[in-house]
């Protein structure tokens, strides 16, 4: 078993690093700022990919792949875009032993290289919409990195769509941010707040950015997904026009949207504990571990354990047996708790005689007795569903407990380390920047979730907590990853 994990209350950041490495999810590489995603971590990403990919295809999207290298002239075509990304870019200046005629940027995001192609593919309204997604790696030269959360190279998906009208583009933006919200809540068991970013926080080159924000156990916010309305900015930069039904030549409307492997970091920080990883069953590659208690006639116990695993796998439950004799049952219990296996079955000679076994839940540690009969798969499925639901409800309860409405700047400063703060803002970049400078808190989201808007009166006018000027709405402030 791995070394002891630092307790969350002792050092939350160290707890996170210890857990990621001890559970063999990821490790540091010899390339500064880059990480190695180990098999346990990559298995989670594959589960995420499979679920998201199915959701993308169900909404009419198809996958493609575009080059890793982007000509410098492309990057410079969209002024806001290059201003936002230039400091983070890695640039290739030489190839084949010679200096390149034009520098190539290693993909920080793909809007420019994709829109250079869309210009060639789009002539008429009949060519629209284009609904393409790409699974890829990107590079952003980060100064301060943290496994999964912020690394120089990371994996993600990026959707890039082209539309005939502004209305269609906005519908796409909202469709995809709601796909992300559904994925976060139904698969990750992660409650999120959906809404719009401020002008200063939006994506470089976007007209507006929509996002989902989640609360981690240290009460900081984590941006879990974004969807951008790019307007006609990239179409104009690349002169991408089409002939409308009326025969007019018009610029195309665009969107882009993406999530990345930082979702694995969100998963860890939202649910895990001092014993290790806690995974929602829908994203667990291995859902059930069966541990034989090897006393007396061990062959009969092992045979029964393997039979149970085979039956569960046949019914769509990912089960496996650890019948190795190199480690004690207690060691195995701790090891699989560390790895986040949702359910543990303990099986000994007496259990076989009574046709029962003990099931332990990873989320609560609660144990129960299950019947070893034809209903076993149903019993396990009920447990898995209960764990999935409990993780969501637990995270939601935590967020609600640590979301506070404040009406003054002194109250704001006194509580900014305690979670999400709901407060009036005057809508100016200046006030937003001053609050960030003084408290390190940012406006995470202008919520659009009806329940939250109603609960906190988000759309009610008031007075800005910082400037004292009139405010048309409340927003959510927090410190963030």
Curated annotation (Swiss-Prot):
Pfam families: HGTP_anticodon, ProRS-C_1, tRNA-synt_2b. It catalyses: tRNA(Pro) + L-proline + ATP = L-prolyl-tRNA(Pro) + AMP + diphosphate. It is an enzyme of class 6 (ligase). InterPro entries: aa-tRNA-synt_IIb, aa-tRNA-synth_II, aa-tRNA-synth_II/BPL/LPL, Anticodon-bd, Anticodon-bd_dom_sf, Pro-tRNA-ligase_IIa, Pro-tRNA-ligase_IIa_arc-type, Pro-tRNA_ligase_II_C. Keywords: Aminoacyl-tRNA synthetase, ATP-binding, Cytoplasm, Ligase, Nucleotide-binding, Protein biosynthesis. Its EC number is 6.1.1.15. GO terms for biological process: prolyl-tRNA aminoacylation. GO terms for cellular component: aminoacyl-tRNA synthetase multienzyme complex; cytoplasm. GO terms for molecular function: ATP binding; proline-tRNA ligase activity. Its main location: cytoplasm. It is found in: Cytoplasm. Catalyzes the attachment of proline to tRNA(Pro) in a two-step reaction: proline is first activated by ATP to form Pro-AMP and then transferred to the acceptor end of tRNA(Pro). Consists of three domains: the N-terminal catalytic domain, the anticodon-binding domain and the C-terminal extension. Homodimer. NCBIfam families: proS_fam_I. Belongs to the class-II aminoacyl-tRNA synthetase family. ProS type 3 subfamily. This is Proline--tRNA ligase. It comes from Prosthecochloris aestuarii (strain DSM 271 / SK 413).
